[in-house]
A protein has these predicted regions:
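Extreme N-terminal leader/targeting segments of oxidoreductases
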Residues: 1-17
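N-terminal Rossmann-like FAD-binding beta1-loop-alpha1 element of flavoenzymes
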Residues: 17-41
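Conserved Rossmann-like nucleotide-cofactor binding loop
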Residues: 25, 48, 317
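Conserved N-terminal glycine-rich FAD pyrophosphate-binding loop of Rossmann-like flavoproteins
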Residues: 46-70
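N-terminal leader/propeptide and maturation segments of large enzyme subunits in energy/redox metabolism
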Residues: 79-105, 110-122, 354-396
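Conserved redox-cofactor binding core of oxidoreductases
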Residues: 99-219, 240-241
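Glycine-rich loop(s) and the adjacent beta-strand/alpha-helix scaffold that form part
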Residues: 216-219, 224-299
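An anion/pyrophosphate-binding glycine-rich loop and adjacent beta-alpha core
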Residues: 275, 279, 285-396
Length: 396
């Protein structure tokens, strides 16, 4: 993690709360603190906030009630399943808090954007204007006719939803709205600024941070935080040295790394944002780095995604039960020669897809060829289209 830099600030500013990182969590923290009346600073080394994708999972609440999914699965069933998936290395109390209260946070989150269109099904038709402004859809809803998560070894609970739009950052519209709410309530942004070191008092309490303003002659500024500093700096996937130490298999096996490729955002100096800044700053003042790093390397498959069609390796051997989630699939492929697998399916794939599990990255619905394609809410990994060109998708 290197050595803490010896830098001195030429300017000092005082706040109640300082947040390092303007991603999803940092933006939400800034809005929440500002709405409570705190004087807030939010520091971000990019020229603006960062976000991507847009999928969430939550149980019960007003959205799921609207969609007919309220109480469809017991909270403790989901929490216990996630505990087993994590081999009990996680804290149940944290998962339970998510299961019981995430829906309240989502209501608050979307409140910032009154123009949001909430769809009642995954592929509900919307106008281009609605899609450009942003929509929220329940995923795999209604559930496929032949799918019952209760009968699955690896169930996908009907709890997921997704923000979609024509923006490159997909859910950027809703994150931007929350950032605007924070600013409207007095939060001050420091874009193009890098967190460099945390400050402590004689009792060990964190009292602030020194930041480097890359857009103002690399001037160092001390931001005091009377109530606390929040580290919301993302991960460390873009730093090869850190990855070699904490997750060496990612580097050794040359696994595609979105952070290293800058696909998760770049700073004002043109470098990837995922460089473990918060990990470093926390460790430098004596904080414990959590054990058991767990890189999210789930496989998303080829044309058919992670749909459980036949998988064979370069020797022509089938090597697994294919009906597993993307992370487990990735783990198995990494054990094969040259980390390579081939997914095989024949001309009956169109008949078989509706019987496939409604999982993340899989296909389980068929869109009829004559369905109107003018609906911009048409692109989802769980759907594919029957057409005369179906052969082109075979044996990928």
């Amino acid at each position: 993690l290197g050595e803490e830099p010896d830098v001195q600030a030429s300017e000092t500013q005082d706040f109640d709360v300082v947040i390092i990182g303007a991603g999803l969590s940092g933006v939400c923290a800034a809005r929440a603190a500002a709405e409570e009346g705190a004087k807030v600073a939010i520091v971000e080394k990019s020229s603006s906030f960062n976000c991507r994708s847009g999928e969430y999972a939550l149980l019960n609440g007003s959205l799921n009630k609207r969609w007919g999914r309220e109480n469809i699965v017991d909270e403790d069933v989901v929490v216990d399943r996630l505990m087993r998936e994590c081999t009990y290395r996680n804290k149940r109390s944290i998962l339970k808090k998510w299961a019981s209260h995430a829906h309240e946070v989502m209501d608050w989150f979307i409140e910032a954007y009154p123009e949001l269109t909430i769809c009642d099904s995954t592929r509900e038709a919307v106008t281009q204007e609605q899609f450009d402004k942003g929509i929220l859809v329940p995923l795999a809803w209604p559930q496929p006719e032949h799918y019952d998560y209760r009968n699955e070894e690896f169930p996908t609970f009907p709890s997921s939803m997704e923000f979609r739009s024509s923006r490159k950052d997909q859910q950027g519209f809703i994150v931007e709205a929350n950032l605007n709410k924070a600013v409207e309530n007095g939060a001050q942004t420091f874009f193009g600024c890098f967190g460099t070191k945390l400050l402590k008092d004689s009792d060990g309490r964190v009292t602030g941070v020194i930041i480097r303003d890359a857009q103002n002659d690399n001037k160092y500024i001390q931001l005091n935080a009377s109530k606390g500093v929040i580290l919301a700096t993302g991960d460390n996937s873009g730093d090869e040295k850190i990855m070699k130490h904490f997750a060496p298999e990612i580097v050794e096996k040359k696994i595609a790394n979105m952070g290293a490729m800058g696909m998760l955002g770049v700073d004002v100096e043109g470098k990837t944002v995922e460089t473990g800044d918060g990990l470093r700053m926390g460790a430098w003042i004596g904080a414990k780095v959590q054990d058991f790093h767990a890189p999210m390397t789930h496989h998303m498959g080829s044309g058919m995604g992670v749909t459980p069609f036949l998988q064979i390796n370069k020797r022509g051997d089938r090597f697994m039960n294919e009906c597993i989630p993307g992370q487990q699939l990735e783990n198995q492929i990494e054990l094969q020669p040259e980390c390579t697998s081939f997914q095989l399916y024949d001309s009956k794939w169109g008949e078989e897809v509706p019987y496939m599990p409604a999982n993340h990255g899989g296909l389980c619905y068929i869109i009829p060829e004559d369905e109107d394609e003018s609906n911009p809410n048409y692109t989802d990994r769980q759907y594919t289209k029957i057409s005369a060109k179906a052969e082109a998708y075979q044996f990928k």
